[in-house]
Amino acid sequence: MAMFVRTSSSTHDEERMLPIEGAPRRRPPVKFIFPPPPLSSLPGFGRPRGYAGPTVIDMSAPDDVFAEDTPSPPATPLDLQISPDQSSGESEYDEDEEDEDEEENDDVQEEDEPEGYPADFFQPLSHLRPRPLARRAHTPKPVAVVAGRVRSSTDTAESEASMGWVSQDDGFSPAGLSPSDDEGVAILEPMAAYTGTGAYGLSPASRNSVPGTQSSPYSDPDEGPSWRPLRAAPTAIVDLTSDSDSDDSSNSPDVNNEAAFTDARHFSHQPPSSEEDGEDQGEVLSQRIGLMDVGQKRKRQSTASSGSEDVVRCQRQPNLSRKAVASVIIISSGSDTDEEPSSAVSVIVSPSSTKGHLPTQSPSTSAHSISSGSTTTAGSRCSDPTRILASTPPLCGNGAYNWPWLD
């Protein structure tokens, strides 16, 4: 078995690198072909067949290589054998027992081991090697654990008293600091519409506690959706199925009339007339629109027109029958002026059909539950909702009206 420890180099490369005559040239590295004779006699370390060269080509080194080290060169396999001085100084066990052991092992040492080498010198050092890690194919591996638990309403008072923190709806705050009473959460009450589906409105008690109404130094009143409290507004009835384009006082009751205003709230309880019984109720549905509530809307930033902008929002309700369809339409009319607040009119389209068994609207959960019943005049902008529905396309985005939960 040959061991090469030299780096081959070409003479042509050296001539190109050192063209000056008389310059010191690097000596070619000396190679270590075979181990010393004691090791070469071991099986596997002998000379190959046909080799007649020297056994060892010595690598000469200058004298100052080991000057800073110990006087002797580094330890080699020859230095690991026990010297006679060390063996003579050892008297840990009896000499008679040592002689008996030597006599028994003389034959074995003569066959397997050369002179001066211990028997286990070339044995595999399996006991000195580090063991590989045990395979954990199906065992759980440790992971980082973060201490924490879900707090309930019963143990927050006891546990947070020692921590000095108070839990709120949106996180934790230091103890002693609690949100003011004005920053409450709006209570949403279900508004029982004619179809009985999920239309919600603000109760009169929760209008003053709508979040965002209080001025904050970190918020811009002109940015984001409006959450200002709703205000009372007039109510009127307009028949969209009518062919007349003029505002006929006979078709729509007077807005300033309290009796007509009360009838407009409960128009869904009116039984169908005798004339409607004669018509085909499966194809023609008599639709009546009640303008229920008007809310204040935030000032628009657009300066495209100095007049008012009318915005229409529609929400489709699930069909309770094939012939009865109801939807909620919010008509928002705003102004760019600061003096006159903008208004939003809610329109409910509720078909009346004798075949469709739809839930009726109770007076307690009618539109009056979110309206204070004021009878102020509506103004000329909302006088003709049919023109608003026909001329103004529906717009997208939040902030166009103050009921974002209808999206």
Swiss-Prot record:
**Low complexity bias (residue ranges):** 342-353, 360-383
List where Acidic residues composition bias occurs.
Answer: 91-115
Q: Name one GO cellular component term.
A: host cell Golgi apparatus
Effect of changing residue 226 to A: reported as: Loss of p53/TP53 sequestration to the host cytoplasm
Compartments where located: Virion tegument; Host cytoplasm; Host nucleus; Host Golgi apparatus
Q: Where is this motif: Nuclear export signal?
A: 284-294
Q: Where is this motif: Nuclear localization signal?
A: 297-300
- Keywords, alphabetical: Early protein, Host cytoplasm, Host Golgi apparatus, Host nucleus, Host-virus interaction, Inhibition of host innate immune response by virus, Inhibition of host IRF7 by virus, Inhibition of host RLR pathway by virus, Phosphoprotein, Viral immunoevasion, Virion, Virion tegument
Instruction: Indicate, by first and last residue, each region the UniProt record lists as having compositional bias (Polar residues).
Output: 1-10, 205-218
Q: Post-translation: what modifications? A: Phosphorylated on Ser-41 and Ser-162 by host IKBKE and TBK1.
User: Which intervals carry biased composition (Basic residues)?
Assistant: 128-139
| Keyword hit for Phosphoprotein | yes
Phosphoserine: modified positions: 41, 162
Keyword Phosphoprotein on this protein?
A: yes
Which residues does the annotated region (Disordered) include?
1-183, 196-318, 332-407
Tell me one GO biological process term. symbiont-mediated perturbation of host innate immune response
Record text on subunit structure and interactions? Interacts with host IRF7. Interacts with host RPS6KA1. Interacts with host RAB11FIP5; this interaction results in the lysosomal degradation of ORF45 and the inhibition of viral particle release. Interacts with host p53/TP53; this interaction down-regulates p53/TP53 signaling pathway. Interacts with the N-terminal part of host NLRP1; relieving autoinhibition of the NLRP1 inflammasome.
Role according to the record:
Prevents the establishment of cellular antiviral state by blocking virus-induced phosphorylation and activation of host interferon regulatory factor 7/IRF7, a transcription factor critical for the induction of interferons alpha and beta. Mechanistically, ORF45 competes with the associated IRF7 and inhibits its phosphorylation by IKBKE or TBK1 by acting as an alternative substrate.
Q: What is this protein called?
A: Protein ORF45
Source organism: Human herpesvirus 8 type P (isolate GK18) (HHV-8)
Q: What lineage is this protein's organism placed in?
A: Viruses, Duplodnaviria, Heunggongvirae, Peploviricota, Herviviricetes
